[in-house]
């Protein structure tokens, strides 16, 4: 005997409805719908944040990071954010490889409101591991700043500022140079102001001294580089700076012209005074040589 259409439809939809019902019951009981994903380290000059997805519903996140003893340390416990600042942990030793993971911890409704069910019945909450993070190798270098520059004759001198990091020693923040030593260098890319052709110069210090053409303006920018790295070895480009040799040449020209005008003016004044004195002397001599008339 054929089954009527409506009971057949209900029979087909029953598993779907049951699954949906169980999902709602699980969520209501505090079971997290899933684990964190897209775990990403965001780190510049050792300022380090771990980010992930998605935004939690009916559960919270807790981050764990391994210390040098291989023990898990809890950070950002019971947070509903999707990021956690781990800077204070990773700057303790920038040459250590850190492991981190994000745990999804469900809520539980109680007489005290919502509470987190952490490690219920001895079971560990679902978690997702982040990739291993070695600060010395993985932190990005921030945009450098050109501190000062000077072009004189055929030489251009450029000094790059030695930026501070969040790494501390004896309570004092260390500079990039103090952390990386000779592994840190800078690349200067420069060109004539009126040209598109570029040249580069590399230094292991913070200063450049390059040969240029006299009286020609130059534009340039700097990049930090970590020589031992295969990836993330260059920083973003600094703000481009340009010398203004036309102003320098104009200034020198004005000084020369001004000096010439001053000397000419002084000469004219002295000549005028001298001529006036001569005229007076001649007039006086004339009066002496002219015989006086008798009354």
Curated annotation (Swiss-Prot):
Main location: membrane
Disulphides: 76-84, 219-242
One of the record's GO molecular function terms: phospholipid binding
Signal peptide as annotated in the record: 1-28
Record membrane topology: Single-pass type I membrane protein
Extracellular side: 29-252
Keyword terms, alphabetized: Blood coagulation, Disulfide bond, Glycoprotein, Hemostasis, Lipoprotein, Membrane, Palmitate, Signal, Transmembrane, Transmembrane helix
Biological process according to GO: activation of plasma proteins involved in acute inflammatory response; blood coagulation; cellular response to hydrogen peroxide; cellular response to low-density lipoprotein particle stimulus; cytokine-mediated signaling pathway; positive regulation of angiogenesis; positive regulation of endothelial cell apoptotic process; positive regulation of endothelial cell proliferation
Lipidation (S-palmitoyl cysteine): 276
Chain positions carrying an annotated carbohydrate: 38, 58, 95, 109, 170, 201
Cellular component aspect of the GO annotation: cell surface; extracellular space; plasma membrane; serine-type peptidase complex
Membrane topology, Cytoplasmic segments: 276-295
Compartment list: Membrane
Segments crossing the lipid bilayer: 253-275
A Pfam family hit: Tissue_fac
Motif WKS motif, chain ranges: 246-248
Function recorded in the entry: Initiates blood coagulation by forming a complex with circulating factor VII or VIIa. The [TF:VIIa] complex activates factors IX or X by specific limited proteolysis. TF plays a role in normal hemostasis by initiating the cell-surface assembly and propagation of the coagulation protease cascade.
Family: Belongs to the tissue factor family.
Subunit composition and interactions: Interacts with HSPE; the interaction, inhibited by heparin, promotes the generation of activated factor X and activates coagulation in the presence of activated factor VII.
Protein name per its UniProtKB record: Tissue factor
Top-level taxonomy: Eukaryota, Metazoa, Chordata, Craniata, Vertebrata
